[in-house]
Amino acid sequence: MTKTGTDHLKSLDDGREVFINGERVTDPINHAAFKNAVRSAAGLYDFQAENEELMTFVSPTSGERVNKCWMMPTSYEQLVERRKSLVAWSRLSCGFMGRSPDHIASSLLGQMMGLPIFERHSPERAKALSDYYAFARDNDLFLTYVIINPQANRSKEASEQDDEFLVCGVVDEDAQGITVRGAKMLGTSSIMANEVLFANIQPLQKGEEKYAISFVVPIATKGLRILSRKSYEEHANSEFDYPLSTHFDENDALIYCDDVHVPWDRVFVYRDTDMCRAQFQDTWGHSSQNYQAQIRLMVKLQFLMGIAKRIAEVNGIIGIASVVLVF
């Protein structure tokens, strides 16, 4: 069955470790800092369940309907179908949800388009990506990602920081997988996501192989902690005065791994600085996620232009020559 908002809210009740204002949050989906934004995300899934033809397609492996953000287009018509679904979701937030579920899905889709590049570096890691993509698609998962390093001493590389595990890196490996320790950013929407993709959008140097990794884990994985920034939603005391921050504050966050174990079938890049760069730059990963972002920004601009036009109408200046030129 098509995933609904209720399904998504239930999936977030998983014991995840979320911290804000220096304290552990015991019930993040109902906390004053997050509850409205979480329900805005859930509303996306209610919308797709109510508009199945517009928003979903049948998974080629599970036979269930999932969001079209996971669809690998093979024709112009499918490209148009997928775009229309991205536009429809963006309009629900007027373009203000920057990390809605279709953003990271689009990134993974683009990386899958470049699967041969992964295969040239490591057939095993390529298979892990391919299998995970099918898993995420078939379960219609909401993913976030952390792809930049914590801001510490910017004059130094990751390996030159005072703490060698300030940046998330490999501590150990065994037959079952790898163990990682350290932090990554920005984790936007991590409170309302199911899983998180770790990767590197910033270049790494030779000798920094311990940081040259990409993997995905559930948010509720043992040892994974979400450290949220201050919440705008929590301090927005009037929906009338703060219509955006009361509903669409996705809360950026630092994500810290305290010796998190990652199974091999969830590791996409391992100790390979060249593949870390290629993951986004040589595949369609970066372009595909930016495609979704440009659609969202288009919707946002339409919304802002609509507000500007309405202000001009209310103020009685819509007929002024300089205003007419704008609209």
Model regions and ranges:
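N-terminal-proximal low-complexity accessory segments that begin disordered
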Residues: 1-47
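Generic, well-ordered alpha-helical scaffold segments in large soluble proteins
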Residues: 37, 44, 135, 139, ...
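Internal helix-loop-helix
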Residues: 46-143
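A short, Trp-centered hydrophobic/proline-enriched beta-strand micro-motif
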Residues: 140-153
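Extended amphipathic alpha-helical segments enriched in small hydrophobics
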Residues: 292-327
